[in-house]
């Protein structure tokens, strides 16, 4: 992947040191944040979790594409949980990253309260809550019998899931949480921007490239 991205003209033109565009620093920060995240999960280090948050904060200040990190790291954490790989290391890494990173990102003027008031950021908040619930469950497991634990978990999960879903729907309809933006709908329907947001569709980087572009870029 590094080889291909290193010789792609579209990437080189935007990421060269001293470039005028945001991507000159943002692409590096994007990859560096993911690197620090992997280190924090591997080591279970709060220090690396904090460094991940600081790198994320710099990314937020540099480029609006920070939302990609905001959703990819929670997705990775969720996949680990679904695979049965929840651990104290994951809990420490994600909790330190999310708490510090979110508070830091809210200091950027154009972001403000978006991390708690837009649908684009709800996945990160949801995974944070899920990890707290799992950690609490693991603690309770030590003090109750197996039968009581199963009943308690099933009841708690059902109630909390319904409550969280109802709260999300209610707050969205009430206008407290903004709906998904057009660029996210464009991920599922590539013609969405062309139909509904012409100004976004007019930007060349938002248009799907022709297959010949991949061949020409690498020759």
Task: Indicate residue ranges for each PLM-predicted region.
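Membrane-embedded helix bundles of polyisoprenyl
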Residues: 1-82, 94-111
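Membrane-lumen/periplasm interface segments of specific transmembrane helices
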Residues: 63, 100-115, 162-179
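Aromatic-rich transmembrane-lumenal/periplasmic boundary elements in polytopic membrane proteins
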Residues: 146-211
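Membrane-interface anchor segments at the N-terminal boundary of transmembrane helices
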Residues: 212-219
